[in-house]
Amino acid sequence: MDELPFGEAAVEQALDELGELDAALLTDIQDMLQLINNQDSDFPGLFDSPYAGGGAGDTEPTSPGANSPESLSSPASLGSSLEAFLGEPKATPASLSPVPSASTALKMYPSVPPFSPGPGIKEEPVPLTILQPPAAQPSPGTLLPPSFPPPPLQLSPAPVLGYSSLPSGFSGTLPGNTQQPPSSLSLASAPGVSPISLHTQVQSSASQQPLPASTAPRTTTVTSQIQRVPVVLQPHFIKADSLLLTTVKTDTGATMKTAGISTLAPGTAVQAGPLQTLVSGGTILATVPLVVDTDKLPIHRLAAGSKALGSAQSRGEKRTAHNAIEKRYRSSINDKIVELKDLVVGTEAKLNKSAVLRKAIDYIRFLQHSNQKLKQENLALRNAAHKSKSLKDLVSACGSAGGTDVAMEGVKPEVVDTLTPPPSDAGSPSQSSPLSLGSRGSSSGGSDSEPDSPVFEDSQVKAQRLHSHGMLDRSRLALCALVFLCLTCNPLASLFGWGIPGPSSASGAHHSSGRSMLEAESRDGSNWTQWLLPPLVWLANGLLVLACLALLFVYGEPVTRPHTSPAVHFWRHRKQADLDLARGDFAQAAQQLWLALQALGRPLPTSNLDLACSLLWNLIRHLLQRLWVGRWLAGRAGGLRRDCGLRMDARASARDAALVYHKLHQLHAMGKYTGGHLIASNLALSALNLAECAGDAVSMATLAEIYVAAALRVKTSLPRALHFLTRFFLSSARQACLAQSGSVPLAMQWLCHPVGHRFFVDGDWAVHGAPQESLYSVAGNPVDPLAQVTRLFCEHLLERALNCIAQPSPGTADGDREFSDALGYLQLLNRCSDAVGTPACSFSVSSSMASTTGTDPVAKWWASLTAVVIHWLRRDEEAAERLYPLVERMPHVLQETERPLPKAALYSFKAARALLDHRKVESGPASLAICEKASGYLRDSLAAPPTGSSIDKAMQLLLCDLLLVARTSMWQRQQSPASAQVAHSASNGSQASALELRGFQQDLSSLRRLAQNFRPAMRRVFLHEATARLMAGASPARTHQLLDRSLRRRAGSSGKGGTVAELEPRPTWREHTEALLLASCYLPPAFLSAPGQQMSMLAEAARTVEKLGDHRLLLDCQQMLLRLGGGTTVTSS
């Protein structure tokens, strides 16, 4: 039969598309196609005239049924091309005799399903007779094979149980379960013979090695009668686990011819493929996919197969090796990540690779920090060991070192190291480390869900260090009531008086009608009991009171010893509270702090009765500690014996409880913890009492912060009649700071200032849960009420500084007081803005907010801007230049705000800087453009809805006045001294340009609009209206009336004028001086009442300017006086 052309390029393309196809599949296809291509050589008489009925020279094509694409065409063409590509020896096919379709009538059998024995069919192995071919002439009736090159390797036949021992037979289960290579089998079947079933099952056990290859190809022939009618069977799909082939038994036998057996390349896996069964005439051709264990083949056979398939499998082997390397690499990485997850978060956690690596990084950083702390502690102990003379000194040094206010007092360093590191994100599992301190007995959520710690088991807690549970507040209050009852009713005196008879009862008992000679003696004997009994009773009462006090303060105080179960529970809840505070989960943090107090034996009151008892006890305890009795007894909590270790543990326990109470009080003050004023007062008193009992264990800054928090509670919760207690707590905080270190923390220094102290005690302010948005300061620490009060004080200082300029009081308006007072407030504001607690500070329970401060850039910027404006008004340009860099860098918060006031302030500063700079000879249009932009932002600010803040109105007045002063200064500089002299004699002076007049009128309109709601702006309206008329050259009569309002400020106001003065504020010294200069320089001489009035006005202005401290303006006034005096002298002469 003809072969279809199939080039090498197409084969390469097909191999590229296959990609990861196994080389074993190519080997199977090669074996199948080799047999099909060599069918003419294997069966030379298959299509001859005895079978086909045609002539030998017939060249007609074969029947379509015999050469259907499913059976012959495609496999033959593919096999030929594959053999050409793989370099296999190809047998030349002999001439075929086609079978005519009319005489051959090939019969297509349908596909047979997998065989299952029926009731009438018996499965039994049929031995086949194996005949060796004769060396000479073959016998008639046998099929002679043509000569063809031998295959690369053949297996010698071996008898197998249940199968014919042919090299080309089916691979079955050997005794050793050795898998044989695939081969081809041809069987001839004839009708009339009973069917024979050959059933194989591939098993997986290995024992027997395959037989060595023979040196020459062998032909095994099974003789049988062959029926002349060819039968073509459809391809059957045979499973690997149950291989079944059913053939029709012929009359005498079957003729079988073996093809060359190809070996599998090492490492190839044979894929299961369909069994191709081809029958032509009476011969059945079948191929079976097999699996060969290459590890058990001889080396020389493996080498032969690798040489034959080396060129075809090189690319596949490279890809397979690369994929295997990548797979091993990924498997190794995944195994290490799983191992890392088990070490960091435990075996039951469900995390992805990124989360595992992130947790590992956090845990490594935690361990590094812990190791650094341990190294420092070891170094300190080593130095102490070198300096100490004995072990007792070293132990005492270690005990004294534990008194510092660190975060983990009372727990050994190894306990600190095994605490749970913080998780990476809020959504991470609660069990963040297998080394976290677990609790078997805790019943709450949060960190209690962590697994039990391998370090701290219940059996490892030291039993010799017992935990003192202490007394509840109800028991303490009952004991106090008992003591008070004993002191008031004195039951011991009544008891002694009833038990010992008095003199009257004794005389009555011995009274008789006769005379008693011993009565005087007995009366003298009973007098000593009357004198001795009251001291004994009071002594007994005193002993009873001392015993009750010792029971309350010494033996009733709960003491938590380190390395005990309550201490472990406390530190777990406290660390979890720190994490919750850092994440902003304040409700969960409050819950953890509540559990921490419960672990210390100090549960918070849950009912109204418990709350009342706790509050009364804390009040009594604070009064006793003010008398130093309670503080002295509390210093010996745990026992009256002189045990330094127990005393240090008692102080550390009191310190830990005080810090937790204080943090809960701060959360309540900021609205993060629910409860009324009584609960807050109880928390404040508890924190204060325990902090005083802790002594040196509490740092100075923490104790002062607790005192200030108590003063805040008095200011917030108690009525106004009891607000004097704030002075007491503030003085206690100041004394505590000065007694220990001699300095006050930076965050509390403003409380020691008279202005700050007055604001705290007498100011009308309140702490809000949610900090209000402000344009003049930033929000501080959200859990620190003192930071919010500091923010309110900064805004108060800014308002006071602005009011000193806008509406100075009559007492401070004399001289330079209005400017100096404003600068003093601004300096204090700068110091306070450097001591504001920022949101980035630590949220730890043990951290002191007073010692952790930041900077408020917004308040600092407004203070610098106001100071620059004041320096400009004072004509002190050198001081203003020092603040230019601070004002030019506007904070990012103000740049992003939607309110136009900050932008109006910035552009007003730029415009005034360009117009008031006397070193510039000319002010170009660029300065006017900046001034117009500032005026636009100012008008937008005035048009915005009012916020109700007085700082906004005062700041708007300052900016509007600054723009008008800058425009006036630019107009005055444009005039020469000659033009000023002309103004004295002419009715009109030098007029400003239309652009300047329009801008001035717009700013003046903004000032009038502001004066409608802010009365202090009315004084500036009169003065700037007069300036506008002078710039426009208007009638001087109205100008003189406007200036006269500022010139008559010194006239005494009568009773009727008091109301007018309230409606029209009196002008300040600065306004009076400006009016004098405008009137003397720009009003015509006809409007002056006397010839020498101009010089008198200039002299008065010079004296006022000297008081204000404006040296440059004073120099200008003196020069004008010299010019006027010289002119007068020349005229008079």
Swiss-Prot record:
Lumenal side: 498-535
Region annotation (Interaction with LMNA) ranges: 227-486
Classification via InterPro entries: bHLH_dom (IPR011598), HLH_DNA-bd_sf (IPR036638)
Transmembrane segments: 477-497, 536-556
Compositionally biased spans, kind Polar residues: 165-180
Site note Cleavage, residues: D452, S453, L479, C480, L518, E519
Gene3D superfamilies in the cross-refs: Helix-loop-helix DNA-binding domain
Region of interest: Transcriptional activation (acidic): 1-60
Activity regulation, per record: Activation by cleavage is down-regulated upon activation of SIRT3-dependent PRKAA1/AMPK-alpha signaling cascade which leads to inhibition of ATP-consuming lipogenesis to restore cellular energy balance.
The keyword Coiled coil appears for this protein: no
UniProt PTM comment: Phosphorylated by AMPK, leading to suppress protein processing and nuclear translocation, and repress target gene expression. Phosphorylation at Ser-396 by SIK1 represses activity possibly by inhibiting DNA-binding.
GO molecular function, one term: transcription coregulator binding
Sequence segments annotated as region (Disordered): 46-78, 131-219, 415-456
Alphabetical UniProt keywords: Activator, Cholesterol metabolism, Cytoplasmic vesicle, DNA-binding, Endoplasmic reticulum, Golgi apparatus, Lipid metabolism, Membrane, Nucleus, Phosphoprotein, Steroid metabolism, Sterol metabolism, Transcription, Transcription regulation, Transmembrane, Transmembrane helix, Ubl conjugation
Chain intervals for the UniProt region annotation (Leucine-zipper): 367-388
The UniProt record lists the keyword Nucleotide-binding: no
Membrane topology (Cytoplasmic): 1-476, 557-1133
Residues recorded as bearing Phosphoserine in the entry: S97, S116, S331, S332, S390, S396, S449, S1046
Family from the record: Belongs to the SREBP family.
Name of the protein described by the UniProt record: Sterol regulatory element-binding protein 1
Native source organism of the sequence: Cricetulus griseus (Chinese hamster)
Lineage, opening ranks: Eukaryota, Metazoa, Chordata, Craniata, Vertebrata
Gene: SREBF1
